[in-house]
Amino acid sequence: MALLELSNISYVVKEKSIIRDVSLSVHDGEYLTIVGPSGSGKSTLLKLCSDLISPTSGVITYNGRDLATIDPESYRKEVGYCFQRPYLFAKTVRRNILFPYDIRGMEPDMIRIKYLFDLL
């Protein structure tokens, strides 16, 4: 079971689709890197996952429970987020993707990372 799962999430503001039909699963111990151009919805996606805003449609679950049914205060004690500021992490995309491995002294899965770079 996924720790955090987004199923067909959309977020619309004033008839403008900010996030459209996004689905993803994050399992315990996994790292997730979200990259994209300015205005592509990265911050909105993090706000949705952090329960700071609610999706227009779709379902977000945490430990198998619909996020809409979980007390926001207790959820926020378990889940946090950090927005990247260019001056704080002024590194290449490669260095930012490797950052979680570096700080834990772990060997990165280079096959997976190469796959991610090929998507860019």
Give the role of each language-model region.
Residues 32-33, 81:
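Short beta-strand immediately N-terminal to the Walker A/P-loop
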Residues 35-37:
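The feature captures the beta-strand-to-loop junction immediately N-terminal to the Walker
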Residues 50:
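Helix-to-loop junction immediately C-terminal to a conserved catalytic motif
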Residues 58-66, 75:
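Conserved ABC transporter NBD signature motif
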Residues 86-95:
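Conserved catalytic motifs of ABC-family nucleotide-binding domains
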Residues 95-110, 119:
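ABC-type ATPase nucleotide-binding domains, specifically the catalytic core motifs of the NBD
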